[in-house]
């Protein structure tokens, strides 16, 4: 599971998911990547499940880059607790993803195999995605 070693503040405001990604929206490290088409909070569990799905196929022949990191804490209250008494405890960590963000990149596989691997990995994600290549430029 991914989570920060330490943060300046443990608990954070929720914020809003508006606009599109102006950074991290092109394939930089690998040849092919998964690009988000919707805004979402990706949990560390979802990122890990997707990483495992890709690793199953890539093994030693290729390389994986995870372009998102869950650095935002999400708090939850106990199920039957009364209102007030402060903010709840940190429950899990999320990465804020805007439309256009490249989530994962791979290299070292054929184009056909890469598409197959990334398509199967995208089923682990709770959003619509598209597979992009370095040449396509988008």
From Swiss-Prot:
GO cellular component, one term: mitochondrial large ribosomal subunit
Ribosomal protein in keyword set: yes
GO BP field: mitochondrial translation
Pfam family, one: Ribosomal_L16
Tree of life domain: Eukaryota
Subcellular location per the Swiss-Prot or TrEMBL entry: Plastid, Chloroplast
Alphabetized GO MF terms: rRNA binding; structural constituent of ribosome
CDD domains on file: Ribosomal_L16_L10e
Main localization category: plastid
Keyword Signal attributed: no
Annotated keywords: Chloroplast, Plastid, Ribonucleoprotein, Ribosomal protein
Family, similarity comment: Belongs to the universal ribosomal protein uL16 family.
Quaternary structure note: Part of the 50S ribosomal subunit.
Protein name per the record: Large ribosomal subunit protein uL16c
Record organism: Emiliania huxleyi (Coccolithophore)
Classification of source organism: Eukaryota, Haptista, Haptophyta, Prymnesiophyceae, Isochrysidales
């Amino acid at each position: 599971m991914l989570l920060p070693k330490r943060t300046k503040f443990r608990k954070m405001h929720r914020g809003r998911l508006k606009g599109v990604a102006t950074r991290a929206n092109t394939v930089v490290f690998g040849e092919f990547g998964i690009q988000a088409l919707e805004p979402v909070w990706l949990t560390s569990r979802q990122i890990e499940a997707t990483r495992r799905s890709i690793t199953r196929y890539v093994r030693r022949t290729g390389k994986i880059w995870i372009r998102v990191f869950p650095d935002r804490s999400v708090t939850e209250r106990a199920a039957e607790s009364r209102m007030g008494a402060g903010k709840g405890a940190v429950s899990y960590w999320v990465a804020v993803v805007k439309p256009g963000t490249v989530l994962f990149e791979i290299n070292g596989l054929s184009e056909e195999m890469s598409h197959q691997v990334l398509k199967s990995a995208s089923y682990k994600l709770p959003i619509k995605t598209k597979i992009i290549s370095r040449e396509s430029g988008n």
